[in-house]
Amino acid sequence: MQVSDFHFELPDELIARYPKAERTASRLLQLDGNSGQLVDGTFKDVLELVEPGDLLVFNNTRVIPARMFGRKASGGKLEVLVERMLDEHTILAHVRSSKPPKPGTELYLGENDEFHAVMQARHDALFEIRFTAETVVLDILNQIGHMPLPPYIDRPDEEADKERYQTVYNQKPGAVAAPTAGLHFDQALLEQIQAKGVELAYVTLHVGAGTFQPVRVENIHDHHMHAEYVEVPQEVVDAITATKARGGRVVAVGTTSVRSLESAAQDALQKGTELKPFFGDTEIFIFPGYQYQLVDCLITNFHLPESTLIMLVSAFAGYEHTMAAYEHAVKEQYRFFSYGDAMFIRKQMTKA
């Protein structure tokens, strides 16, 4: 398949630049992967769509204030976007400046040069930067960092984004983009879902800035995914095994939860073992033709044209059904991307 197969026209006004006042106030488009049937509704419908015995799997990563502004010792301005923290004092980052800094370049970060750092090495498009202060990276980011809103939101971050660009159940700092399907859940809805007899479980995938990189090849088979760190702990493996045994469904909240679970499944397949905990980097790329091992239903936002994430959805619901659903969403003026509306998708049981 070609990248252009996943193109759709999206009017600019449908890109959500701010979230709704209430998390659960978004709209929800249901898609049945078998029939292609579409149902328009609101996000609170999720409570009716999940059933006792189901398992909801969330990504509990926490978005770090990963964008910093500063200057080189020579005076040139720069912007640093953390891709991942390598240790308590070192980051791997994207750097925007008039000229890329060379190894040994001294950097001053923060509005008032609060923190001194040194560019250590370059790894392809990323820069390894070490802070000289005793303060740990996470504390530095909390002092001078900005929330790394996606480029298409196209506005500076505001105070409200510190809360609204996080899920209510976040636990483990490390992401530079939110697992956005989870933004629709508030504490009350989570409690109602649990009261209905639905189990909740948490994986961790620290979303990298690479999630916003365009696919730069025409044939999707030639695309190489960026690596992201994943944790699928023993309790999640146990919960999935128990859910499948009782005939319940595994409902993944967000494409990052899907990629976490399916990474663990692929690891077990390759090793010829039963499902086991998975801790490590994943470069899993899911596109039509992929056979899902664990996930039965998917809650996800609307994704960018020609992105790896619309390809993942197409593998789940079928290509034709997915593109028809997106056409419907544009026509019905759903809000798109991170702060936008959501879908609830039942997996296509036949091959896409």
From Swiss-Prot:
Q: Does the keyword Cytoplasm apply?
A: yes
Q: Where in the cell is it found?
A: Cytoplasm
Q: What is its main location?
A: cytoplasm
GO molecular function terms listed in the Swiss-Prot or TrEMBL record: S-adenosylmethionine:tRNA ribosyltransferase-isomerase activity
| Domain of life the protein comes from | Bacteria
Q: Does the keyword Transferase apply?
A: yes
Q: Which UniProt keywords apply?
A: Cytoplasm, Queuosine biosynthesis, S-adenosyl-L-methionine, Transferase
Which biological process annotations from GO are given for this protein?
A: queuosine biosynthetic process; tRNA wobble guanine modification
Q: Name the SUPFAM superfamilies on file.
A: QueA-like
| Pathway terms, separated by semicolons | tRNA modification; tRNA-queuosine biosynthesis
- Which InterPro entries does the record match to this protein? QueA, QueA_dom1, QueA_dom2, QueA_sf
* Catalyzed reactions per annotation: 7-aminomethyl-7-carbaguanosine(34) in tRNA + S-adenosyl-L-methionine = epoxyqueuosine(34) in tRNA + adenine + L-methionine + 2 H(+)
Short name of any one Pfam family annotated for the protein:
Queuosine_synth
For this protein, what is the EC number?
A: 2.4.99.17
Q: A Gene Ontology CC term for this entry?
A: cytoplasm
- Classification via HAMAP family: QueA
Give the family per the record.
Belongs to the QueA family.
- What is known about what this protein does? Transfers and isomerizes the ribose moiety from AdoMet to the 7-aminomethyl group of 7-deazaguanine (preQ1-tRNA) to give epoxyqueuosine (oQ-tRNA).
Q: How does it assemble?
A: Monomer.
Q: What is the protein's given name?
A: S-adenosylmethionine:tRNA ribosyltransferase-isomerase
Q: What organism is recorded for this protein?
A: Vibrio cholerae serotype O1 (strain ATCC 39315 / El Tor Inaba N16961)
Ranked from the top, the taxonomy reads: Bacteria, Pseudomonadati, Pseudomonadota, Gammaproteobacteria, Vibrionales
Q: Encoded by which gene? A: queA
